[in-house]
Amino acid sequence: MAELILFNKPFQVLSQFTDDRPQNRRVTLAEWINKPGFYPAGRLDYDSEGLLLLTDCGSLQHRIASPQNKIPKTYWVQVEGEIPDSAIEQLCNGVKLKDGLTRPAKAHRMAQPTVWPRTPPVRYRESIPTSWLELTITEGRNRQVRRMTAAMGYPTLRLIRYRVGGWTLDNLLPGEFTLNQVNLPDSPQPGVARSGRTKTHSRKANRRPKQP
């Protein structure tokens, strides 16, 4: 039985335990997680927030992170502007990027989710409204979600990963994680056993994410 960490990665934290920069080093996972032998299963950009999975099992790591398995990943995306039905439809059908057409996705507008305030806060332009959408993709190109919305003319302001496969961000605040037991024959579905939530940092918001 493998172990899997579900971690709510805060904004501006690297999805790795070390920073290769000789100067101006960035915050890494080592500031939050002290579990020898655990490594990220996939990645989440420095300027994105939300669910990051880590495991001590190479087989499980491969099953989660391999593009061949096409595990769906769901994001809550705040964009600049009021995104129309035509843009939603194109996100679903595929968006032409420099590295090719994206796979079909699932996308729909959503109400603003009940989540923690970001630190530092998002910079808004007062004269321009914003929209939230839920976007589910099955591939992991570099900065894909941001490039998809930008190609539609709606830059991403805030990006939160809510779900990877059957695992979700529910009940986790930024910097918190849970340690789960996973039966490999059942993965990438959620584990059958789970420990209590572990606080790893005191700088938390006072509201938990809820599925809209």
At which residue positions do the language-model features occur?
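Intrinsically disordered, Lys/Arg-rich low-complexity segments
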Residues: 191-212
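RNA pseudouridine synthases
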Residues: 1-189, 210-212
